[in-house]
Amino acid sequence: MAAAALRDQLTALLSSMFSQGLVDEQFQQLQMLQDEGGTPGFVSEVVTLFCDDADRIINEIATLLEQPVVNFDKVDAYVHQLKGSSASVGAQKVKFTCMQFRQFCQDKSRDGCLMALAVVRNDFYDLRNKFQTMLQLEQQIQAYDPKQQ
Amino acid sequence: MTVVDAESRFHVLAVDDSLIDRKLIEMLLKNSSYQVTTVDSGSKALELLGLRDEGDDSSSSPSSSSPDHQEIDVNLIITDYCMPGMTGYDLLKRVKGSSSLKDIPVVIMSSENVPARINRCLEDGAEEFFLKPVKLADMKKLKSHLLKRKQQLPMAAAAPDKPPHKPDEAAASAAAIAEAATAQTDGIISDCSCSGSSKRKAAAMEQEVISSPDQRTKPRLSSTSSGLAVET
Protein backbone atom coordinates (compact mmCIF):
# COMPACT_ATOMS: atom_id res chain seq x y z
CA MET A 1 0.00 0.00 0.00
CA ALA A 2 2.94 2.28 0.60
CA ALA A 3 3.82 2.04 -3.06
CA ALA A 4 0.30 3.10 -3.98
CA ALA A 5 0.61 6.11 -1.68
CA LEU A 6 3.88 7.05 -3.33
CA ARG A 7 2.27 6.73 -6.73
CA ASP A 8 -0.51 9.05 -5.63
CA GLN A 9 2.08 11.51 -4.45
CA LEU A 10 3.89 11.33 -7.78
CA THR A 11 0.67 11.81 -9.73
CA ALA A 12 -0.25 14.80 -7.58
CA LEU A 13 3.19 16.31 -8.05
CA LEU A 14 3.10 15.89 -11.81
CA SER A 15 -0.37 17.33 -12.16
CA SER A 16 0.58 20.34 -10.04
CA MET A 17 3.63 20.87 -12.26
CA PHE A 18 1.34 20.91 -15.28
CA SER A 19 -1.30 23.13 -13.74
CA GLN A 20 1.34 25.63 -12.62
CA GLY A 21 2.71 25.68 -16.15
CA LEU A 22 6.16 24.51 -15.07
CA VAL A 23 6.07 21.80 -17.70
CA ASP A 24 4.08 21.35 -20.90
CA GLU A 25 3.06 18.62 -23.31
CA GLN A 26 6.64 18.09 -24.44
CA PHE A 27 7.38 16.74 -20.98
CA GLN A 28 4.38 14.44 -21.32
CA GLN A 29 5.84 13.23 -24.57
CA LEU A 30 9.10 12.30 -22.86
CA GLN A 31 7.16 10.25 -20.35
CA MET A 32 5.20 8.62 -23.13
CA LEU A 33 8.39 7.77 -25.03
CA GLN A 34 9.80 6.23 -21.88
CA ASP A 35 6.71 4.15 -21.19
CA GLU A 36 6.20 2.99 -24.75
CA GLY A 37 9.86 2.41 -25.49
CA GLY A 38 10.38 0.35 -22.35
CA THR A 39 13.34 2.50 -21.36
CA PRO A 40 12.83 3.29 -17.67
CA GLY A 41 15.73 5.69 -17.21
CA PHE A 42 15.00 7.98 -20.12
CA VAL A 43 13.13 10.81 -18.39
CA SER A 44 15.56 10.72 -15.50
CA GLU A 45 18.52 10.90 -17.88
CA VAL A 46 17.13 13.80 -19.91
CA VAL A 47 15.96 15.72 -16.84
CA THR A 48 19.38 15.30 -15.20
CA LEU A 49 21.12 16.46 -18.37
CA PHE A 50 18.83 19.47 -18.50
CA CYS A 51 19.44 20.43 -14.88
CA ASP A 52 23.21 20.19 -15.23
CA ASP A 53 23.14 22.10 -18.50
CA ALA A 54 20.83 24.84 -17.22
CA ASP A 55 22.85 25.26 -14.05
CA ARG A 56 26.04 25.67 -16.08
CA ILE A 57 24.43 28.14 -18.51
CA ILE A 58 22.94 30.27 -15.72
CA ASN A 59 26.36 30.53 -14.07
CA GLU A 60 27.97 31.48 -17.38
CA ILE A 61 25.38 34.21 -17.91
CA ALA A 62 25.89 35.52 -14.38
CA THR A 63 29.63 35.76 -15.01
CA LEU A 64 29.10 37.56 -18.31
CA LEU A 65 26.75 40.09 -16.72
CA GLU A 66 29.36 40.92 -14.08
CA GLN A 67 31.86 42.10 -16.68
CA PRO A 68 32.50 45.85 -16.92
CA VAL A 69 31.51 45.71 -20.57
CA VAL A 70 28.80 43.17 -21.17
CA ASN A 71 28.93 41.12 -24.35
CA PHE A 72 25.19 40.95 -24.98
CA ASP A 73 25.53 38.75 -28.04
CA LYS A 74 27.27 36.15 -25.95
CA VAL A 75 24.61 36.42 -23.25
CA ASP A 76 21.95 36.05 -25.91
CA ALA A 77 23.63 32.94 -27.31
CA TYR A 78 23.56 31.32 -23.86
CA VAL A 79 19.94 32.29 -23.29
CA HIS A 80 19.11 30.84 -26.69
CA GLN A 81 20.78 27.58 -25.67
CA LEU A 82 18.86 27.48 -22.43
CA LYS A 83 15.64 28.19 -24.25
CA GLY A 84 16.34 25.27 -26.59
CA SER A 85 17.07 22.85 -23.76
CA SER A 86 13.97 23.99 -21.89
CA ALA A 87 11.81 23.49 -24.95
CA SER A 88 13.23 20.01 -25.48
CA VAL A 89 12.39 18.79 -22.00
CA GLY A 90 9.14 20.75 -21.82
CA ALA A 91 10.30 23.15 -19.10
CA GLN A 92 7.70 25.64 -20.20
CA LYS A 93 8.11 28.34 -17.58
CA VAL A 94 11.88 28.51 -17.96
CA LYS A 95 11.41 28.61 -21.72
CA PHE A 96 9.01 31.57 -21.51
CA THR A 97 11.34 33.43 -19.17
CA CYS A 98 14.18 32.87 -21.65
CA MET A 99 12.07 34.41 -24.40
CA GLN A 100 11.65 37.58 -22.32
CA PHE A 101 15.32 37.47 -21.41
CA ARG A 102 16.30 37.56 -25.08
CA GLN A 103 14.41 40.80 -25.51
CA PHE A 104 16.58 42.43 -22.84
CA CYS A 105 19.67 41.10 -24.63
CA GLN A 106 18.53 42.69 -27.84
CA ASP A 107 17.89 45.97 -26.02
CA LYS A 108 21.37 45.64 -24.50
CA SER A 109 19.95 46.40 -21.09
CA ARG A 110 22.14 45.19 -18.26
CA ASP A 111 19.51 45.93 -15.62
CA GLY A 112 16.89 44.13 -17.66
CA CYS A 113 19.20 41.17 -18.11
CA LEU A 114 20.04 41.02 -14.41
CA MET A 115 16.36 41.04 -13.57
CA ALA A 116 15.64 38.35 -16.15
CA LEU A 117 18.52 36.28 -14.82
CA ALA A 118 17.04 36.42 -11.33
CA VAL A 119 13.69 35.27 -12.67
CA VAL A 120 15.20 32.47 -14.76
CA ARG A 121 17.27 31.31 -11.84
CA ASN A 122 14.26 31.30 -9.57
CA ASP A 123 12.10 29.44 -12.08
CA PHE A 124 14.84 26.94 -12.72
CA TYR A 125 15.54 26.23 -9.04
CA ASP A 126 11.86 25.76 -8.44
CA LEU A 127 11.61 23.31 -11.33
CA ARG A 128 14.77 21.49 -10.34
CA ASN A 129 13.39 20.92 -6.84
CA LYS A 130 10.24 19.43 -8.31
CA PHE A 131 12.21 17.29 -10.74
CA GLN A 132 14.37 16.01 -7.90
CA THR A 133 11.32 15.13 -5.83
CA MET A 134 9.82 13.42 -8.88
CA LEU A 135 12.93 11.31 -9.46
CA GLN A 136 13.13 10.38 -5.78
CA LEU A 137 9.51 9.27 -5.77
CA GLU A 138 10.08 7.21 -8.90
CA GLN A 139 13.06 5.53 -7.33
CA GLN A 140 11.10 4.74 -4.18
CA ILE A 141 8.23 3.33 -6.21
CA GLN A 142 10.60 1.15 -8.19
CA ALA A 143 12.22 -0.09 -5.01
CA TYR A 144 8.84 -1.42 -3.92
CA ASP A 145 8.10 -3.15 -7.17
CA PRO A 146 11.04 -3.55 -9.52
CA LYS A 147 8.94 -5.29 -12.17
CA GLN A 148 6.48 -2.46 -12.39
CA GLN A 149 8.32 0.06 -14.55
CA MET B 1 28.18 8.40 -31.65
CA THR B 2 25.64 5.76 -30.80
CA VAL B 3 24.30 2.97 -32.94
CA VAL B 4 21.16 1.22 -31.85
CA ASP B 5 18.73 -1.35 -33.15
CA ALA B 6 20.68 -2.64 -36.12
CA GLU B 7 17.79 -4.85 -37.18
CA SER B 8 15.46 -2.18 -38.43
CA ARG B 9 15.18 -1.20 -42.04
CA PHE B 10 15.92 2.47 -42.30
CA HIS B 11 19.05 4.04 -41.00
CA VAL B 12 18.78 7.67 -39.94
CA LEU B 13 21.77 9.87 -39.22
CA ALA B 14 20.82 12.53 -36.65
CA VAL B 15 23.02 15.61 -36.28
CA ASP B 16 22.66 17.97 -33.32
CA ASP B 17 25.16 19.80 -31.15
CA SER B 18 22.90 19.60 -28.10
CA LEU B 19 23.23 16.37 -26.11
CA ILE B 20 19.68 16.67 -24.79
CA ASP B 21 18.35 17.02 -28.30
CA ARG B 22 20.42 14.09 -29.52
CA LYS B 23 18.95 11.94 -26.74
CA LEU B 24 15.49 13.10 -27.64
CA ILE B 25 15.75 12.56 -31.38
CA GLU B 26 17.37 9.20 -30.85
CA MET B 27 14.51 8.15 -28.59
CA LEU B 28 11.91 9.42 -31.04
CA LEU B 29 13.52 7.60 -33.95
CA LYS B 30 14.01 4.40 -31.96
CA ASN B 31 10.37 4.51 -30.96
CA SER B 32 9.47 4.71 -34.62
CA SER B 33 11.76 1.68 -35.22
CA TYR B 34 14.47 3.38 -37.17
CA GLN B 35 18.10 2.51 -36.85
CA VAL B 36 19.81 5.60 -35.45
CA THR B 37 23.29 7.02 -35.46
CA THR B 38 23.84 10.37 -33.75
CA VAL B 39 26.71 12.80 -34.16
CA ASP B 40 27.26 16.25 -32.65
CA SER B 41 28.42 18.19 -35.71
CA GLY B 42 28.04 18.53 -39.44
CA SER B 43 31.68 17.74 -40.05
CA LYS B 44 31.38 14.48 -38.13
CA ALA B 45 28.31 13.66 -40.19
CA LEU B 46 30.26 14.22 -43.41
CA GLU B 47 33.13 12.16 -42.09
CA LEU B 48 30.75 9.33 -41.35
CA LEU B 49 29.27 9.63 -44.81
CA GLY B 50 32.74 9.43 -46.33
CA LEU B 51 32.94 13.05 -47.45
CA ARG B 52 36.08 14.30 -45.82
CA ASP B 53 37.81 17.05 -47.73
CA GLU B 54 36.73 20.66 -47.59
CA GLY B 55 37.12 21.06 -51.36
CA ASP B 56 34.24 20.74 -53.77
CA ASP B 57 33.90 17.14 -54.83
CA SER B 58 33.03 18.20 -58.37
CA SER B 59 29.41 17.20 -58.59
CA SER B 60 29.46 18.38 -62.19
CA SER B 61 31.73 15.56 -63.22
CA PRO B 62 29.75 12.39 -63.83
CA SER B 63 32.74 10.11 -63.26
CA SER B 64 33.27 11.16 -59.64
CA SER B 65 31.20 8.41 -58.09
CA SER B 66 34.10 6.36 -56.78
CA PRO B 67 36.30 8.71 -54.70
CA ASP B 68 33.82 9.56 -52.00
CA HIS B 69 32.23 6.23 -51.28
CA GLN B 70 29.85 6.05 -48.35
CA GLU B 71 31.33 4.74 -45.14
CA ILE B 72 27.97 3.71 -43.78
CA ASP B 73 24.66 3.28 -45.45
CA VAL B 74 22.39 6.14 -44.42
CA ASN B 75 18.83 6.41 -45.67
CA LEU B 76 18.06 9.83 -44.27
CA ILE B 77 19.82 12.70 -42.53
CA ILE B 78 18.03 14.79 -39.93
CA THR B 79 19.99 17.79 -38.77
CA ASP B 80 19.70 20.76 -36.47
CA TYR B 81 19.93 24.10 -38.25
CA CYS B 82 21.75 26.17 -35.68
CA MET B 83 25.10 24.60 -34.83
CA PRO B 84 28.52 26.14 -34.21
CA GLY B 85 30.86 25.78 -37.17
CA MET B 86 28.97 24.01 -39.91
CA THR B 87 25.27 24.81 -39.76
CA GLY B 88 22.56 22.40 -40.82
CA TYR B 89 22.16 24.47 -43.96
CA ASP B 90 25.88 24.12 -44.75
CA LEU B 91 25.56 20.38 -44.25
CA LEU B 92 22.56 20.29 -46.58
CA LYS B 93 24.53 22.12 -49.27
CA ARG B 94 27.48 19.76 -48.92
CA VAL B 95 25.27 16.69 -49.13
CA LYS B 96 23.29 17.99 -52.10
CA GLY B 97 26.51 19.06 -53.80
CA SER B 98 28.02 15.62 -53.57
CA SER B 99 27.41 13.20 -56.41
CA SER B 100 27.41 10.22 -54.07
CA LEU B 101 25.27 11.70 -51.30
CA LYS B 102 22.85 14.00 -53.06
CA ASP B 103 20.05 11.41 -53.15
CA ILE B 104 19.95 11.04 -49.38
CA PRO B 105 16.92 12.95 -48.09
CA VAL B 106 17.78 15.71 -45.64
CA VAL B 107 15.41 17.02 -42.98
CA ILE B 108 16.24 20.22 -41.08
CA MET B 109 15.15 21.02 -37.53
CA SER B 110 15.14 24.42 -35.91
CA SER B 111 13.72 25.98 -32.80
CA GLU B 112 13.12 29.24 -34.62
CA ASN B 113 10.21 29.77 -36.95
CA VAL B 114 11.91 31.96 -39.53
CA PRO B 115 10.02 31.72 -42.84
CA ALA B 116 12.97 32.90 -44.95
CA ARG B 117 15.16 30.22 -43.42
CA ILE B 118 12.56 27.52 -43.90
CA ASN B 119 12.09 28.48 -47.55
CA ARG B 120 15.79 28.58 -48.21
CA CYS B 121 16.28 25.09 -46.82
CA LEU B 122 13.34 23.66 -48.76
CA GLU B 123 14.36 25.37 -51.97
CA ASP B 124 17.90 24.07 -51.66
CA GLY B 125 16.87 20.46 -51.37
CA ALA B 126 15.69 19.78 -47.82
CA GLU B 127 12.73 17.40 -47.80
CA GLU B 128 11.16 18.77 -44.68
CA PHE B 129 11.55 21.37 -41.99
CA PHE B 130 10.62 20.49 -38.41
CA LEU B 131 10.17 23.01 -35.67
CA LYS B 132 11.77 22.01 -32.40
CA PRO B 133 11.00 20.38 -30.14
CA VAL B 134 10.48 17.54 -32.56
CA LYS B 135 7.43 15.38 -31.91
CA LEU B 136 6.58 11.76 -32.43
CA ALA B 137 4.13 12.82 -35.14
CA ASP B 138 7.03 14.34 -37.09
CA MET B 139 8.71 10.96 -37.22
CA LYS B 140 5.80 9.58 -39.20
CA LYS B 141 6.45 12.17 -41.89
CA LEU B 142 9.95 10.78 -42.38
CA LYS B 143 8.54 7.51 -43.64
CA SER B 144 7.14 9.09 -46.79
CA HIS B 145 10.56 10.44 -47.77
CA LEU B 146 12.17 7.11 -47.08
CA LEU B 147 9.57 5.24 -49.09
CA LYS B 148 9.88 7.63 -52.01
CA ARG B 149 13.60 6.97 -52.10
CA LYS B 150 12.95 3.25 -51.98
CA GLN B 151 11.02 3.49 -55.22
CA GLN B 152 14.01 5.09 -56.90
CA LEU B 153 16.53 2.85 -55.27
CA PRO B 154 16.46 -0.25 -57.52
CA MET B 155 17.96 1.71 -60.41
CA ALA B 156 20.80 3.03 -58.32
CA ALA B 157 21.45 -0.42 -56.91
CA ALA B 158 21.48 -2.02 -60.35
CA ALA B 159 24.02 0.42 -61.75
CA PRO B 160 25.92 2.17 -58.98
CA ASP B 161 28.48 3.73 -61.32
CA LYS B 162 25.90 5.34 -63.46
CA PRO B 163 26.23 9.11 -63.83
CA PRO B 164 23.57 10.87 -61.81
CA HIS B 165 21.74 12.61 -64.60
CA LYS B 166 21.29 10.05 -67.35
CA PRO B 167 18.16 10.76 -69.32
CA ASP B 168 16.49 7.42 -68.56
CA GLU B 169 16.91 7.95 -64.84
CA ALA B 170 15.52 11.42 -65.10
CA ALA B 171 12.58 9.98 -66.94
CA ALA B 172 12.17 7.39 -64.24
CA SER B 173 12.17 10.08 -61.55
CA ALA B 174 9.61 12.00 -63.50
CA ALA B 175 7.52 8.87 -63.69
CA ALA B 176 7.98 8.38 -59.98
CA ILE B 177 6.89 11.96 -59.37
CA ALA B 178 3.81 11.42 -61.47
CA GLU B 179 3.12 8.14 -59.71
CA ALA B 180 3.59 9.71 -56.32
CA ALA B 181 1.31 12.59 -57.25
CA THR B 182 -1.47 10.29 -58.36
CA ALA B 183 -1.02 8.21 -55.25
CA GLN B 184 -1.78 11.32 -53.18
CA THR B 185 1.55 11.31 -51.46
CA ASP B 186 3.45 14.47 -50.70
CA GLY B 187 4.07 14.86 -54.40
CA ILE B 188 7.33 16.70 -54.87
CA ILE B 189 10.47 14.64 -54.76
CA SER B 190 13.60 16.51 -55.63
CA ASP B 191 12.52 19.85 -56.98
CA CYS B 192 10.83 22.18 -54.56
CA SER B 193 8.15 23.93 -56.52
CA CYS B 194 6.57 26.93 -54.88
CA SER B 195 3.37 25.17 -53.99
CA GLY B 196 5.22 22.26 -52.46
CA SER B 197 7.49 24.32 -50.33
CA SER B 198 4.79 26.63 -49.15
CA LYS B 199 2.66 23.68 -48.26
CA ARG B 200 5.42 22.23 -46.15
CA LYS B 201 6.16 25.62 -44.75
CA ALA B 202 2.56 25.96 -43.75
CA ALA B 203 2.70 22.57 -42.11
CA ALA B 204 5.82 23.59 -40.22
CA MET B 205 4.33 26.85 -39.06
CA GLU B 206 1.13 25.18 -38.08
CA GLN B 207 3.06 23.16 -35.55
CA GLU B 208 3.50 26.05 -33.23
CA VAL B 209 -0.16 26.81 -33.15
CA ILE B 210 -1.67 23.38 -32.92
CA SER B 211 -1.70 21.88 -29.49
CA SER B 212 -4.37 19.37 -28.73
CA PRO B 213 -4.99 18.44 -25.12
CA ASP B 214 -4.73 14.68 -25.75
CA GLN B 215 -1.40 14.73 -27.51
CA ARG B 216 -0.21 12.06 -25.24
CA THR B 217 -2.24 9.46 -26.99
CA LYS B 218 -3.05 11.00 -30.34
CA PRO B 219 -0.22 13.24 -31.37
CA ARG B 220 -1.29 15.90 -33.81
CA LEU B 221 -3.19 14.04 -36.42
CA SER B 222 -4.11 17.35 -37.92
CA SER B 223 -0.65 18.11 -39.19
CA THR B 224 -0.17 14.66 -40.67
CA SER B 225 -3.42 14.86 -42.56
CA SER B 226 -2.79 18.32 -43.96
CA GLY B 227 -1.21 17.43 -47.25
CA LEU B 228 1.28 14.98 -45.90
CA ALA B 229 -0.78 11.82 -46.07
CA VAL B 230 1.16 8.77 -47.17
CA GLU B 231 -1.17 5.83 -47.01
CA THR B 232 -3.41 5.19 -49.95
From Swiss-Prot, chain A:
Entry-linked InterPro entries: AHP1-5/YPD1, HPT_dom_sf, Sig_transdc_His_kin_Hpt_dom
Any one Gene Ontology molecular-function term assigned to this protein's record: protein histidine kinase binding
Subcellular location: Cytoplasm, Cytosol; Nucleus
Entry PTM: Two-component system major event consists of a His-to-Asp phosphorelay between a sensor histidine kinase (HK) and a response regulator (RR). In plants, the His-to-Asp phosphorelay involves an additional intermediate named Histidine-containing phosphotransfer protein (HPt). This multistep phosphorelay consists of a His-Asp-His-Asp sequential transfer of a phosphate group between first a His and an Asp of the HK protein, followed by the transfer to a conserved His of the HPt protein and finally the transfer to an Asp in the receiver domain of the RR protein.
Keywords: Cytokinin signaling pathway, Cytoplasm, Nucleus, Phosphoprotein, Sensory transduction, Two-component regulatory system
GO biological processes: cytokinin-activated signaling pathway; phosphorelay signal transduction system; positive regulation of cytokinin-activated signaling pathway
Tissue: Widely expressed.
Phenotype when the gene is knocked out: Dwarf, narrow leaf, small grain and low fertility phenotypes.
UniProt modified residues of type Phosphohistidine: 80
CDD domains attached to this UniProt entry: HPT (cd00088)
GO cellular component, one term: cytoplasm
UniProt domain HPt: residue ranges: 39-144
Ranges in coiled-coil conformation: none
More about this protein: Plant silencing simultaneously OHP1 and OHP2 exhibit phenotypes for a deficiency in cytokinin signaling, including dwarfism with reduced internode lengths, enhanced lateral root growth, early leaf senescence, and reduced tiller numbers and fertility.
Domain notes: Histidine-containing phosphotransfer domain (HPt) contains an active histidine that mediates the phosphotransfer.
Function: Functions as a two-component phosphorelay mediators between cytokinin sensor histidine kinases and response regulators (B-type ARRs). Plays an important role in propagating cytokinin signal transduction through the multistep His-to-Asp phosphorelay. Functions as a positive regulator of the cytokinin signaling pathway. May play a regulatory role in salt and drought tolerance during plant development.
Name by which UniProt lists this protein: Histidine-containing phosphotransfer protein 2
The species this protein was found in: Oryza sativa subsp. japonica
UniProtKB/Swiss-Prot annotation, chain B:
Disulfide bonds: none
Keyword entries, A-Z: Cytokinin signaling pathway, Nucleus, Phosphoprotein, Transcription, Transcription regulation, Two-component regulatory system
Keyword Isomerase: no
Post-translational modification: Two-component system major event consists of a His-to-Asp phosphorelay between a sensor histidine kinase (HK) and a response regulator (RR). In plants, the His-to-Asp phosphorelay involves an additional intermediate named Histidine-containing phosphotransfer protein (HPt). This multistep phosphorelay consists of a His-Asp-His-Asp sequential transfer of a phosphate group between first a His and an Asp of the HK protein, followed by the transfer to a conserved His of the HPt protein and finally the transfer to an Asp in the receiver domain of the RR protein.
Induction or repression: By cytokinin in roots, shoots and leaves.
GO biological process, one term: cytokinin-activated signaling pathway
Record SMART domains: REC (SM00448)
Transcription recorded as keyword: yes
Family the UniProt entry places it in: Belongs to the ARR family. Type-A subfamily.
Location(s) in or outside the cell: Nucleus
Bias-annotated ranges (Polar residues): 209-232
InterPro entries, per the entry: ARR-like, CheY-like_superfamily, Sig_transdc_resp-reg_receiver
Tissue: Expressed in roots, leaf blades, leaf sheaths, shoot apex, flowers and panicles.
Positions where 4-aspartylphosphate occurs in the chain: 80
Domain Response regulatory, residue spans: 11-147
CDD domains: REC_typeA_ARR
PANTHER family: TWO-COMPONENT RESPONSE REGULATOR, TWO-COMPONENT RESPONSE REGULATOR ORR4
Location of the region described as Disordered in the Swiss-Prot/TrEMBL record: 153-174, 202-232
GO terms under cellular component: nucleus
The protein's name in its UniProt record: Two-component response regulator ORR4
First-listed, main subcellular location of the protein, grouped into a coarse class: nucleus
Function field: Functions as a response regulator involved in His-to-Asp phosphorelay signal transduction system. Phosphorylation of the Asp residue in the receiver domain activates the ability of the protein to promote the transcription of target genes. Type-A response regulators seem to act as negative regulators of the cytokinin signaling.
